[in-house]
């Protein structure tokens, strides 16, 4: 009797619920993302016969091959030795970091910022997620310009929002000549038509990943005025703010009081100090009430950000301002691009000359890959650029990112011949990459 009861109870328990109760967002989308596919391909390629004995050169994901500046490392080491700095910080950020950010940005915004204008976050991505979570109700729409940083999409959708895509139109003859970021343009009439009664926000990224475009004052003014007209919040992703190679860098929040009141600006210590693993970012706004919603969401997402690294960033910002570090970094990156793009000039492969960021898009239309080249099934189901990337990893030992991942399926043809390379590497590493890419001559 007892055994029969146990058997019946067990059967009841095993059939009343599924084995795993998971969020449908993650169970319905089982396809591997570009980062997983590229990293797995690189790991396998490292062991193939052609790459044995030579280093795989990874210019794919935007992580640095070198350490943060010595002054930042010293500040992190000092912070770890202070007992209370290893405990929770205030949810909106350590006062020391907030004060350093006020010191950094007040001259830029031409006003004396206050603590209520700043929220520290656990990286810029969490800052964007906090902005969206603080703003969106189910069904609200967010306009995203295409191509986009892929993390924007799940951030919006996990907050119950709907993504509306507006293209950044590529220049003509992209496959025939070198172009500039300024030649990639937004049709602002199309942008305004995309706004509906459900539109809550727009995300603008400048300098832009992956294009390398720095939006002009005129473009941002047009965008900002349309947002003011329709009361649309602007989330300005400015994580590459110190990496612009144009004469100036325009921040949309500074263009008018009305635009500033609708803008949330996101920044990153990881990008500023070659320390992407530190996971320290921030959100700024001249509208303290608007920012407060992002701050409340941040509190619920992670409560507080890493205290020792906040302290390190606070002091590193002060150090950087004293020694002109950010300008020096800009000049270093101008040289890095000069080193790296020289091979494409030599080979005659067109690219979009970056106006900012540490990325460059290169057109591989002229590269002749054997038609019978073997690809894994998961690559065959992707865009042409995934096949080019897979071939480049396996044959030349160079890793790049296929940028159709930054487009929706219907529009990915615009990038099917492109690859994105990251130059956030030391100069010797880039020189090795150039030597390796010279092997492309055999395929032109």
Swiss-Prot record:
GO terms for cellular component: cytoplasm; mitochondrion. SUPFAM superfamilies: PLP-dependent transferases. GO terms for molecular function: 2-aminoadipate transaminase activity; kynurenine-oxoglutarate transaminase activity; pyridoxal phosphate binding. Pathway: Amino-acid degradation; L-kynurenine degradation; kynurenate from L-kynurenine: step 1/2. It catalyses: L-kynurenine + 2-oxoglutarate = kynurenate + L-glutamate + H2O. Its cofactor is pyridoxal 5'-phosphate. The keyword Transferase applies. Its EC number is 2.6.1.7. Pfam families: Aminotran_1_2 (PF00155). Keywords: Aminotransferase, Cytoplasm, Mitochondrion, Pyridoxal phosphate, Transferase. GO terms for biological process: kynurenic acid biosynthetic process; L-kynurenine catabolic process. The keyword Lipid metabolism does not apply. CDD domains: AAT_like. It comes from the Eukaryota. PROSITE patterns: AA_TRANSFER_CLASS_1 (PS00105). It is found in: Cytoplasm; Mitochondrion. Present with 1600 molecules/cell in log phase SD medium. Catalyzes the irreversible transamination of the L-tryptophan metabolite L-kynurenine to form kynurenic acid (KA). Belongs to the class-I pyridoxal-phosphate-dependent aminotransferase family. This is Probable kynurenine--oxoglutarate transaminase BNA3. It comes from Saccharomyces cerevisiae (strain ATCC 204508 / S288c). The gene is BNA3.
């Amino acid at each position: 009797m007892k055994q029969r009861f146990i058997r019946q109870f067990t059967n009841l328990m095993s059939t009343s619920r599924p084995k795993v109760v998971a969020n449908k967002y993650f169970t319905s989308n089982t396809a591997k993302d570009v980062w997983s596919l590229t990293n797995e391909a690189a790991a396998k390629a490292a062991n193939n016969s052609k790459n044995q004995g030579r280093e795989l050169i990874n210019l794919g994901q935007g992580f640095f091959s070198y350490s943060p500046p010595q002054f930042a490392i010293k500040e992190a080491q000092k912070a770890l030795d202070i007992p209370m700095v290893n405990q929770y910080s205030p949810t909106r950020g350590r006062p020391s970091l907030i004060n350093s950010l006020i010191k950094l940005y007040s001259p830029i915004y031409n006003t004396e910022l206050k603590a209520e204008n700043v929220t520290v976050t656990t990286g810029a991505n969490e800052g964007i997620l906090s902005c969206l979570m603080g703003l969106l109700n189910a069904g609200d729409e967010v306009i995203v310009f295409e191509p986009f940083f892929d993390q924007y999409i799940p951030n919006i959708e996990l907050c119950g929002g709907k993504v509306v895509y507006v293209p950044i139109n590529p220049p003509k003859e992209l496959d025939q000549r070198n172009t500039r970021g300024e030649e990639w343009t937004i049709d602002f009439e199309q942008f305004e038509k995309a706004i509906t009664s459900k539109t809550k926000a727009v995300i603008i990224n400048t300098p832009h990943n992956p294009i390398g475009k720095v939006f002009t004052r005129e473009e941002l003014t047009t965008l900002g005025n349309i947002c003011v007209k329709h009361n649309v919040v602007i989330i300005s992703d400015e994580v590459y703010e110190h990496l612009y190679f144009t004469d100036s860098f325009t921040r949309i929040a500074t263009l008018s009081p009305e635009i500033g009141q609708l803008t949330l600006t996101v920044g990153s210590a990881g990008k500023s100090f070659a320390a992407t693993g530190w996971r320290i970012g921030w959100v700024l706004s001249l509208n303290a009430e608007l920012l407060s919603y992002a701050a409340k969401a941040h509190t619920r997402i992670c409560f507080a950000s890493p205290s020792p690294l906040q302290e390190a960033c606070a002091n590193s910002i002060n150090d950087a301002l004293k020694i002109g570090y950010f300008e020096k970094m800009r000049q270093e990156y101008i040289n890095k691009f000069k080193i790296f793009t020289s091979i494409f000039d030599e080979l005659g492969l067109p690219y979009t000359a970056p106006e900012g960021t540490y990325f460059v898009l290169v057109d591989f239309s002229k590269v002749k890959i054997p038609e019978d080249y073997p690809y894994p099934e998961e690559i065959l189901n992707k865009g042409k650029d995934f096949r080019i990337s897979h071939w480049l990893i396996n044959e030349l030992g160079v890793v790049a990112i296929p940028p159709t991942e930054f487009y929706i399926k219907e529009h990915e043809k615009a990038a099917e011949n492109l690859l994105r390379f990251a130059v956030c590497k030391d100069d010797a590493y880039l020189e090795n990459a150039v030597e390796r890419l010279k092997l492309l001559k055999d395929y032109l």
